[in-house]
Amino acid sequence: MRKILIITLTFLFSYLTHANDFEDAKDTIQLRQISMQGIWERVKRLAPFIDFDENLDYSQELAVQDAKDIKLLLEKSKTMWPKSTNLSTKNLTNATPAIWAIEEYFVKLYAEAEIAASNLEIALKENDWENVDLEMCNLGNACGTCHASFRRLLTSQLANEASAWSGKYIRDCN
């Protein structure tokens, strides 16, 4: 009887641990998605400000803050890619398993995005518009390549995400 009780308790503990791990993974995925959406919102606000020399209802101060937020969101979401969040087969994430299969490439692209975001913030603070354009293009290239390589896209999402995937956030990017 004691063996049955031990086996039952072991099974129950294992099940509860697995359930908690699954919930933790789902929470991490949700935080990651919110971070990425926050980055995209800021990119969409920044792009017209950088692209057009018009008096928009958006100031350089807001542009610097958006660049700073992009950098911060990238820093905060950097650790939100543990293997336990590889739940694309359960349709809980659009991140493909390739992230974890070729992790070095993912880390390289992520680092490029972080560097571009940091340099973009500096260029905006210094009114260095040539480098603002360059770093916005670098950010677009890093994010666009990462999305094209590691994000599953459903046909229904194509219209919404085409500009994010192209990596061409401003018109002068090659």
Question: Which residues are covered by each model-predicted region?
Answer:
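Sec-dependent N-terminal signal peptides
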Residues: I4-F13
